[in-house]
């Protein structure tokens, strides 16, 4: 769950800057967003499967396994009843084999306690072992279309570069601030598109190495532009426009 204590030690962008960021991001996404199968469903189980699979695994490796998995385990009930060894074998070769066990554990708890459904509220989602703050936010915004923030590696990198660009991006204090930024930026409408856009932007434009700054729609206001040195050594000088 996002930690809010002392999270506002760093300033959040004023409303005009937030609106400008949302507008530019959504415009870019509608032109360049990836066409992915889990974006064509609002089934909470399907969203859960995609989010667990995408942890530590590239999209192109997940795509065929996602389709295979849902063909074999089309519902929480089917997954909950499946033999554990079979579930692990079906997961191969995605790796990190704790993930299929946690996914099946979530399915079993959902069947036992919630009528084979995932709950939509954050507090209950966070009681499931294997669902953290990011996954809970993804389920709430992608499956239930609720106004919920997300913060994974890609999103954190985008927000840090565009709005901060100084300090240690991996510190606990910065992580709290980036959660606050994400919560502040989430729009009242188009939450699904906005959060998907953030992830795509971090995966396609604001990448970890050699980001595509020259074609970036945020370059006029990005605090890190142009990104040509370790971010922790850069300040706002000349790039806060």
Question: Where do the PLM segments sit?
Answer:
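Short, low-complexity, charge-dense intrinsically disordered segments
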Residues: 233-240
